[in-house]
Amino acid sequence: MSETQASQVPQAPLEACPICVKQQGEVIGGPVYQDDLVYANHVYNREGPTFLGYVRVETRRHAPSFAELTPAEAQAVGVLMARVSRALKACTGADHVYAFFYGDHVPHLHVHLFARYPGTPEEFWRERVDEWSESPKGGADEVAALCQRLRGFLAENPQ
């Protein structure tokens, strides 16, 4: 999709999209990474303990799916997914990082990255890693500390 075609994709009002709204405000731990094309933050569960190692990579522009991305956005999403995956492995000791894209709940491109920790039983692999009772969980302070480590890794490893 060319830059001109991308500008012609219908845009939802920013206030109607929870991802657009979130990117304009504050998130627990702050953004892990952001530039003009992409944004990443650690997900925080306000209703209980948060699984440590769940980061979302999102486009800055309101684009519903991969089909609407410009070449520059597609490249930026892919590169950031790889960088954040490396950061999650280095900063959490995860032995694997899952990437999920569903695209049918919130129409703003976002990819879910989940760390899988050593010893995670196979029945809790994939989208169930956070359901394992022994998976690392924490509150706002632990999320903020992990975000700081992730930002540090990304700053020291720009590629």
Segments predicted by a language model, with ranges:
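HIT superfamily nucleotide-processing domains
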Residues: M1-Q159
